[in-house]
Amino acid sequence: MPGAVHSGFEAWRGMIPADALPPGFDLENTQLIWGRGAHAVLYPVRKGRYLNAVICARSRDRSLRLPRKGDAGVLLDSLRGWHPSLRQLFELVREWPVWPLLEMPRKGPWHHGRMALIGDAAHGMLPFAAQGAAMGIEDAEVLAAMVERHGTSEAALAAWGALRRKRVRKVVALARQNGRIYHMGWPFSMARNLVLGLTSPGNLAERQAWIYDWKP
């Protein structure tokens, strides 16, 4: 089966203790921040004891090693146009491991005989729709149903793949589209921000409602 390929993006990931955060910092919600050259996602982990900071940007290093040690100075220099409050927040991170963002080839097989790959192993995707783990859970649900119907045979795996491919491809396409939107350069980013400012939260949620409406 074909291996993973580099998507051209990388993710810098760092943890900040909650007690080091500025007073009043929102530790209840996930925050998505668009900036020049990158985007950031902030969300609480470990029952709110830490803030996980993830900064995604285009990568010059196309190696597949997992992960490499990031240079905080290089990262902060790349974010020099960002708001000072965000740069100060990122300065609280002690270590920045850098992960290459990988994808699996679209046309690769998901099973061979009675052996199968599911989740990221079969269809690793960009994290820009936050659906990689969810697709793995759905895979398991559908695979269990096909094994119940066909037994532990190759037919079960063939049926599972036929049922899953169309939906997974649609989610992969959405993640890639989000990546293009998140990393738009000037002046397209100005138009993006204008449209976003005129869009209600309900309409934004509706854009991905088809994902959450899925039934096995």
Model-found features: residue ranges?
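Conserved FAD-binding catalytic core of PHBH/FMO-like flavoproteins
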Residues: 1-88, 93-94, 107
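Alpha-helix N-cap and coil->helix boundary residues
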Residues: 7, 152-155, 190
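Alpha-helical structural elements of signaling/regulatory helical domains
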Residues: 81-85, 149-152, 166, 187
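C-terminal auxiliary extensions adjacent to catalytic cores
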Residues: 196-216
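Conserved mid-domain beta->alpha element of the FAD-binding
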Residues: 12, 42, 74, 95-181
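Short, hydrophobic secondary-structure boundary micro-motifs
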Residues: 87-90, 169-172, 206-208
